[in-house]
Amino acid sequence: ENDRIEAVALAVPVTLQGRTGCYLYGLTGQGSLILAGLVDHLCAQQRAKGAGFVVTVPTGPEQAALLQDKGFQWAFPLRCLPREVERNLWSQAEFDSVTAKKLCELRERFWPDTVQLDPERMAVVLGDLYSAGATIVSSEHGYGIYFREEDTLYFVELQADTDRAAEVLMEAAREKEVIVEKAVITVGASQTLFLGEGTRQEYGMIRFDGEPFDVTESYMRLMLEG
């Protein structure tokens, strides 16, 4: 309108449980009516291309309410939990050896029920993480993506076979970062790591444009939103 962009969003292809869908990225606009119209347009466009669902990460309560009016519902909750990190010189792991393709494979292995970007788009996510100072720690039994702030490791994703395997990753990261004593971990609410610990928080939303399916155990994270 008047050569001004009133609303913008990008529809990015994703998969979940073998189904094709899309992720609405960067949804912003001037006024709720314009934004609602854009959501309608994009969802219809993606449905015509065969997308059975649309996922997104709302920027705040106001946008979440607008999306709910458009048929979206909360999904993919997270758990945030603090952990003390023990000193253990025997805990070994590799650092920053994970490629975008490998990260997609690791997610498929540790949590197949995950909203997946393709490796090309995951490379963009990985590049943004590294640019922001992230480190990836990995072993045969798991991997974690973390940022260090002062004496704390902030894990934005952590997947492992067992609680102990996850602790080994954190202990190896502590040895690398030297001054670290604790970690704050964000995992999927239904993830089996440190089950029963942490505070639940909402994260993503989904709208079904095809046959609805069960996403109560599904996971979504690191979706280009920075």
Q: Each PLM stretch: what is its role?
A:
Residues 103, 165-169:
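Hydrophobic side chains in well-ordered alpha-helices
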Residues 57-60, 64-92, 159-163, 171-226:
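Active-site/acyl-donor-binding loops of N-acyltransferases
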Residues 47, 70-154:
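Amide-forming acyltransferase catalytic core, primarily the GNAT-like/NAT-type
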Residues 54-57, 116, 138, 145, ...:
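A structural signal for short, well-ordered beta-strand segments and their strand-loop junctions
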Residues 37-53, 168-181:
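Conserved acyl-CoA
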Residues 1-40, 131-165:
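Conserved donor-binding loop and adjoining core beta-sheet/short helix segment
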Residues 28, 39-43, 64, 68:
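Short, well-ordered alpha-helical packing segments
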